[in-house]
UniProtKB/Swiss-Prot annotation:
Its EC number is 3.1.13.4. This is Putative CCR4-associated factor 1 homolog 4. It catalyses: Exonucleolytic cleavage of poly(A) to 5'-AMP. A divalent metal cation binds at D29, E31, D145, D218. Its main location: nucleus. It comes from Arabidopsis thaliana. GO terms for cellular component: CCR4-NOT complex; cytoplasm; nucleus. Pfam families: CAF1. It is found in: Nucleus; Cytoplasm. Its cofactor is a divalent metal cation. GO terms for molecular function: metal ion binding; poly(A)-specific ribonuclease activity; RNA binding. InterPro entries: CNOT7/CNOT8/Pop2, RNase_CAF1, RNaseH-like_sf, RNaseH_sf. Ubiquitous transcription factor required for a diverse set of processes. It is a component of the CCR4 complex involved in the control of gene expression. Component of the CCR4-NOT complex, at least composed of CRR4 and CAF1 proteins.
Amino acid sequence: MGEVWRWNKEVEMDSIRDCLKHFSSIAIDTEFPGCLKETPMDASEEIRYRDMKFNVDNTHLIQLGFTLFDRRGITKTWEINLSDFNEHKCFKNDKSIAFLKSNGLNLDKIGEEGIGIEEFFRDFSQILKEKDGKITWVNFQGSYDNAYLVKGLTGGKPLPETKEEFHETVEQLLGKFVFDVKKIAESCSGLSSRFGLQRIADVLQMKRVGKAHHAGSDSELTARVFTKLTFDLLNSRKQCVRRVDHQQYQLEQQQLMMTRCYIPIPIPIPRPRSVMFAAHHPNPYFGGGYFGMPVQGRNYVL
């Protein structure tokens, strides 16, 4: 895992550029000073976006982690340390800052040796342009991750006013292929969208590389979980298709057997011969009169 600071930025950015020539999927994670406005659980989508916009517009990103990967595996993870946040001067959520510190983030070092947000995103934007939008982005519960990316890639401008405009901006900047692992987990047996990243990794028996709640480690784990879940879903889909094909084959065989054995086959029935009757003289023993008597030995066609 590569830690990116002001003093090694040039080398690491060149490494990112080279790796993006061969890998087109990026898993991201962000660490930021928490939420200034807490959103109620039952809030509408409009209120959720309004609160997110307020929080992102008024805070500074602390770390950006991203991992380049494809279906063959992971190439490398970078943890970008960004220097704009100042614990003593900037807006923050005190509980969130205490939480980050308890998990080992050295905010003083990041502020002193990190890279300016504007400087980093200027270089990063240029690298992304070279890919011409052919990138798949992956996150975990990534609304804020996407929001900080949009803010950075637009030069620190406020987020769009509405969630519809925000989604359009995300598509313009990141493309159409943006996946949230938390939502993918809804479709997987034994998992739930209520699970956090670490719990999903535990269910999948995946060991973390690095420390939790560090942007680099979280992005690396997100990439591996995404690869595992999508691989399993693909296999599950293939198995489902095979089961359907097998059931269809059995049905066709049953229909074929019905055709062979149970559909009535018409059997030709010979046309009966016509019988001509001839009048005979009355028998004197039966009271007289005439009666019909079949003519023997002759065939007549009517």
